Structure formats: C-alpha cells, structure tokens
C-alpha cells in the first residue's frame, strides 16, 4: 500500500504481477483509524472486482512501507478479528492473504521510541481517550489473529527511522509462530547506507531491484507452500 509510489508499483507489474495501488487519506487530515477504514474498503473493492483483472485472487500479497507497512500489518490482523474490526470501525474485506511484504514498517506507536513524536499526529491528540488506545503497538493486537500469513520484512543500515521497529516486529512475529524472514541490508553490500524504504523509492536501482526480487521469491515460496498444504 502506497500513497503515490507509482514507480514501485510499476516495478512489481514489470515482473508479471497484477498490482492494485491503494491510496488512503493522509494525516493530519485523518488518523490511523480512518486510514485503516480506507484500506479495508479498498481491499473489499479488490475482492469484489478482482475477477475483472487477470489475477489470482487466491494468492494475494499485501505490501506497504513505513506507515503503510503499519497499515498493512494491522489490516492483516483486522481481517481475522471481528472484535478489532468493530473497535476500529472497519468493514470486513473477506479476503485471505498468502503473504505480507513489510518495508520498514512502523508498527509500534504507543511505545515507539523516535516514532512517539508522531503518535498524536497519526492517532489524534485524544488518542488516550479512544477505544483503540490499547492497540497502538502491534504486539497488543497480534493475538487477535488466528494465523498471520508468511511475512517478509526489509530494512537497511541507513534506515534510521524504522530499523529498530522492523527488527522488533520481526521478533514479535517469530515469538507468535508466524513464518517470517527479515533482510537488513548492511552498508557493505552496496558500499552505501541504504535509506529508509530504499526499495520503494529506488526500485530500478541495483539495491532496490535485488530487494524486490528477494521479496517476491519469498512470495513465490509462500504460494508453493500453500498449494502443498
């Protein structure tokens, strides 16, 4: 899920995938709650209209970067929890995911270190008074999901905004038995500290291309494993 990351979507489509680019309203005009509502409605639309496109609706990968990674991760849980959908006031997309691809996700806002600066803009100045207050960190909602899909996470040495958050999310997923893999690109790999969400911002550069290829290989493995079940 990306605000206007057309180049990244094009890079995915160039590899033969059908790509739906979900545009959601942005803070400070709305909060995370309303963004999740936008995403859920968009996913419902994809479910209802996907047959009009040359895509396999039985093998969907949901992806997002940075705050969009948070929305993707949260949406995956909300799909499996009527209780949380009621709390966040979202529709049920009635969709099953084969894989998640999260690039530098920001999934810990209640106790998110550096990202705590963005808590009020993203969740609202009255966030402590909302029904969603107990669910602002991903480890507070993961138990509401019966079985999250295989998840691939990307970060890098220059990802000062979300490197720690990405590793923390990976550890939470591992602790809850989710098949998860993380790729943290070190400076030595490309002789530079790759920045926050580099594969999304620079999908046609060597590092971005390699990162996308590895992530999609994970997706292909998830599809193969699903067929074998």
Per-range role (PLM):
Residues 3-229:
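Alpha/beta-hydrolase superfamily serine-hydrolase fold, recognizing
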């Amino acid at each position: 899920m990306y605000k206007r990351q057309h180049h990244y979507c094009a890079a995915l489509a160039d590899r033969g995938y059908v790509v739906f680019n979900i545009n959601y309203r942005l803070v400070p005009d709305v909060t995370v709650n309303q963004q999740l509502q936008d995403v859920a409605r968009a996913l419902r639309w994809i479910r209802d209209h996907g047959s009009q496109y040359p895509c396999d609706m039985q093998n969907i990968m949901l992806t997002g970067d940075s705050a969009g990674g948070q929305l993707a991760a949260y949406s995956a849980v909300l799909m499996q929890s009527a209780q949380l959908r009621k709390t966040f006031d979202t529709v049920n997309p009635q969709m099953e995911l084969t894989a998640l691809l999260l690039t530098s996700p920001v999934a810990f806002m209640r106790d998110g270190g550096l990202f705590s600066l963005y808590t009020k803009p993203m969740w609202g100045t009255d966030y402590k008074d909302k029904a969603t207050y107990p669910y602002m960190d991903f480890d507070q909602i993961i138990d509401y999901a019966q079985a999250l899909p295989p998840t691939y996470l990307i970060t890098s040495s220059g990802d000062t905004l979300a490197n720690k958050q990405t590793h923390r999310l990976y550890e939470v997923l591992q602790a809850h038995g989710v098949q998860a893999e993380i790729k943290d690109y070190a400076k030595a790999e490309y002789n530079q500290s790759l920045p926050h969400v580099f594969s999304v911002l620079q999908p046609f550069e060597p590092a971005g291309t390699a990162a996308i290829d590895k992530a999609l290989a994970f997706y292909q493995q998830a599809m193969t494993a699903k067929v074998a079940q």
